Amino acid sequence: QRQMCIRDSPFAIGWTPYTLKCMLVGLLLYGCGIALYYSSRENRRPGEEYGSAKWGSPKELNRKYMDHQHKDANIILTQRVRLGMDGYITQRNMNVLVVGGSGSGKTRFFCKPNIYSANCSYLITDPKGELLRAAGALLAAQGYEVRVFNLIDPSQSDGYNPFSYIHSEKDVLTLIDNLIKNTTPRNASSNDPFWERGEIALDSALMLYLVSEAPSEEQNFETLIYMMNFADVKEEDEQYRSPLDMLFRALEEEQPNHVAVKQYAIFKQAAGKTAKSIVVTAAVRLATFNIPQYAEITRKDEMDFGSLGEKKKAIFCLIPVDDSSMNYLVGMLYTQCFQALYRRADAKYNGRLPVPVRVIQDEWANVAQPESYPKILATCRSYNIGLNIIVQNVQQIKALYEKEHESIIGNCDTLLFLGGGNEPTSLEFIVKLLGRETLATRTRGLTKGRNGSSTTNYQQTGRDLMTIDEVRKLDTHKAILFIRGEDPVIDRKYNLKRHPNIKLTLDGKAKPYIHKPQGAPDYALPDLPYAFKSLDDYEFIDMEEPEHELSEKEKDFKPDKTE
């Protein structure tokens, strides 16, 4: 009968007096088994005991990160690897760090291919003007607006006036701070901050005066240093009033709370000898703008940095390779360009520019970068901006940003190593970045003699994916590519001759591009307003006259505002 019940209802569950006891015993045995398993289990990663580094596949990397729908909208990295420019799709920023020794092809294998693609707006540092000559005609044919800031031959330069990007008192202080930092030698010993603050007070007073009181054509560094030439200081006579003092006194009578008046008052608190030292220091720092050719290219502005993110536009900054004394002007340009792009994006486009902007900084270490460069690297992705840092070795980054060099490297999701250098720091850096792999080794032992024997041992050991010696001897035609979160790959450098737009460039036998500036400035420095309108006509008091007579003349002085 029991067998018939089981046959008719094989899944029927019956309850007996032993059911509960059996369940408890079963649970107890199950718990003991789990405890025994975890107590005896070891932390094992077979084949990865000494490291899990391995080489990736260029084909797989390209399949994952290339923008296949818009094949022209990619960053060219190696012969077989592209990176899409839409960060929301790739989840990687457009910041690329390119490291390669002299002759490794940083310009040929990275800069030129990406400029020839003509798929975004560009801000380019161009030593020797090589990139402009090679790519200018192509960009012009593609409908680009090409602008050039030429420190090699200023007569062929478009205008860049830093005053055109001053929109508030804060911008004035930022510009002065950038000017001072970019014209101070990198390894200069720190001076008393008093002198620097005094110089800032004087410079800011003059800039704020020009921005608020002078016509737009007079708002430039040439006018500023012209004004500074009249900041006479008599060490032996604290009561002496220079023409510049008279100018600010006239402004104070009209607008006592003017910020320029307040800044000038800070400067005037310095004693005669101290004030003279401040004036001399400030004048020497601005001496560049006494040179006619540099004064001319900074009189008016033709760059319009904000439009880089709105239309196809390329700005080339040409710097001489044998003289870096004027490169601080490019540093100022970069600072104001980033400010203008961020401001335009926030004001008009909800924080993201419609046209991608790539900043290709060849010879990055030769141009003073903005003080906030690490922050710009960290935030530019959301604004649709990508920074491409091109250096000969990692030590150049450490020299400029000793405390923040790791942050700069870390904010570049892509690193391209082109080889061609013997600098130990860079070689060690690449070796550590590649990591270590686990290898299976076999050792054999042989004992000869009457009772000879042989043994074979199998074991695992760790090894760098590439040693320093192997990195140093990397094939000239190959590069090592790192993309954040991916295995490194070795691939051939890009073949420039296979670029689809090569025929329109100098490398494709086209004629070199010769830039024609927008036109020579038609502005000649007029006299300044207020006291400067008739400065040469003033009859200044001889310092040997009695002190009470000097004070009387000062008291009666009124600037002629009707001229």
Please annotate each region the language model reported.
Residues 58-87:
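N-terminal pre-Walker A segment at the start of P-loop NTPase domains
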Residues 2-6:
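Short, small-residue-biased leader/transition segments that mark boundaries at the very start
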Residues 377-480:
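Conserved ATP-driven motor cores of ASCE-family P-loop NTPases powering translocation/secretion/packaging/pilus
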Residues 7-23:
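Membrane-interface segments at the starts/ends of alpha-helical transmembrane spans
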Residues 1, 73-78, 176, 180:
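Glycine-centered structural positions embedded in regular secondary structure
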Residues 19-34:
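Canonical hydrophobic alpha-helical transmembrane segment
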Residues 92-385, 400-403, 410, 461, ...:
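P-loop NTPase motor domains
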Residues 33-54:
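Juxtamembrane/interface segments at transmembrane-helix termini
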